[in-house]
Curated annotation (Swiss-Prot):
Task performed by this protein: Component of the ubiquinol-cytochrome c reductase complex (complex III or cytochrome b-c1 complex) that is part of the mitochondrial respiratory chain. The b-c1 complex mediates electron transfer from ubiquinol to cytochrome c. Contributes to the generation of a proton gradient across the mitochondrial membrane that is then used for ATP synthesis.
Membrane topology: Multi-pass membrane protein
Subunit relationships: The cytochrome bc1 complex contains 11 subunits: 3 respiratory subunits (MT-CYB, CYC1 and UQCRFS1), 2 core proteins (UQCRC1 and UQCRC2) and 6 low-molecular weight proteins (UQCRH/QCR6, UQCRB/QCR7, UQCRQ/QCR8, UQCR10/QCR9, UQCR11/QCR10 and a cleavage product of UQCRFS1). This cytochrome bc1 complex then forms a dimer.
Name of this chain's protein: Cytochrome b
Organism: Xerus rutilus
GO annotation terms (biological process): mitochondrial electron transport, ubiquinol to cytochrome c
Residues passing through the membrane, by range: 33-53, 77-98, 113-133, 178-198, 226-246, 288-308, 320-340, 347-367
Cofactor: heme b
Length: 379
């Protein structure tokens, strides 16, 4: 009699994905973030579901309903802060996951990589709409500023913005539709994540050396299931420390003031995980140019497979490319810092230089360095 795990039509799929999956024997803790992202998504969907039971998407009561959740609902404060900080944890894992893909050359799996970039866009859209829902000052003005960027699109821009707003400004219609989209998008993300996994399991995982590992593979369970659980506990420790000790650390104090269309906050800025893109947007004085740079800063990830000029897949044995990669990481930290600063000297010029460096490293320096390394290795 065959094992149910291997013969049952439904359990068989789970078995091939998480139990008997042949996995390279040398993948490091950097390969943990895929499963952690899955857990983050589940946490966000569950906490979001319970928040949606008490939240009202009306401009007059949205802010009060969030206060009601925190004060009157059983453990409402915990659910709310887990959801808010869960987004931050989600993005930390996302950035590390993408960074690992860039470092170890995982982008050579075209379909997996491009669906990953699409997932990044979808998660960013979901997080942006979620930030609008508490209807605080930064929610309202963030929504106004970011949606207004679409007016830079020639000819159709103004009509498009008013269509998204559902009126002539960010108002009740905008909040209602943002809530609807914020509710549905995580399920679309879950579906995309399954497609992401489907394509990954067609080729098998990459590994730190970047070499083909078919001759040396081990089953995912128990080896990597245990390893992933360790990563999960470390993530939960950091996450719950943040939620229980300083839940407002990553938030904006302005969002504790109810939205007021007549009073503009001194510095309008998005959540920390968008600051790098926001800095790139602000570094260009022209509105349309800024919007194009903003979109390009993420879309440029789809260029990685095309720009790969090295004879080696991974950066593990390429010290010059490694140096450039870490300069790029430092540059992203700089952009994140600049995005949170006011638009004044010297922050403007630092932001412009950091933006130029970001695109130069990816489009020019990394491919040229890889070619030089090929020459140094006499390939």
């Amino acid at each position: 009699m065959t094992n149910t795990r291997k013969s049952h039509p439904l359990i068989k799929i789970i078995n091939h994905s998480f139990i008997d999956l042949p996995t390279p024997s040398n993948i490091s803790a950097w390969w943990n973030f895929g499963s952690l992202l899955g857990i983050c998504l589940v946490v966000q969907i569950l906490t979001g579901l319970f928040l949606a039971m008490h939240y009202t998407s009306d401009t007059t009561t949205a802010f009060s309903s969030v206060a009601h959740i925190c004060r009157d609902v059983n453990y409402g404060w915990l659910i709310r802060y887990m959801h808010a900080n869960g987004a931050s944890m989600f993005f930390i894992c996302l950035f590390l996951h993408v960074g690992r893909g860039m470092y170890y050359g995982s982008y050579t799996f075209f379909e997996t990589w491009n669906i990953g970039v699409l997932l990044l866009f979808t998660v960013m859209a979901t997080a942006f709409m979620g930030y609008v829902l508490p209807w605080g000052q930064m929610s309202f003005w963030g929504a106004t500023v970011i949606t207004n960027l679409l007016s830079a699109i020639p000819y159709a821009g103004t009509n498009l913005v008013e269509w998204i707003w559902g009126g002539f400004s960010v108002d009740k219609a905008t909040l209602t539709r943002f809530f609807a989209f914020h509710f549905i998008l995580p399920f679309i993300i879950a579906a995309l994540a399954m497609v992401h996994l489907l394509f990954l399991h067609e080729t098998g995982s990459n590994n730190p050396s970047g070499l083909i590992s078919d001759s040396d593979k081990i089953p995912f369970h128990p080896y990597y299931s245990i390893k992933d659980i360790l990563g999960l506990f470390i993530l939960l420790l950091a996450f719950m420390t943040l939620v229980l000790f300083s839940p407002d650390l990553l938030g904006d104090p302005d969002n504790y003031t109810p939205a007021n269309p007549l009073s503009t906050p001194p510095h309008i800025k998005p959540e920390w995980y968008f600051l790098f893109a926001y800095a790139i947007l602000r570094s260009i004085p022209n509105k349309l140019g800024g919007v194009l740079a903003l979109i390009s800063s993420i879309l440029i990830l789809t260029m990685f497979p095309i720009l790969h000029t090295s004879k080696q897949r991974s950066m593990m044995f390429r010290p010059l490319s490694q140096c450039l990669f870490w300069v790029l990481v430092a540059d992203l930290f700089t952009l994140t810092w600049i995005g949170g600063q006011p638009v004044e000297h010297p922050f403007i010029i630092i932001g412009q230089l950091a933006s130029i460096l970001y695109f130069t490293i990816i489009l020019l320096l990394l491919p040229l360095t890889a070619l030089m390394e090929n020459k140094l290795l006499k390939w």
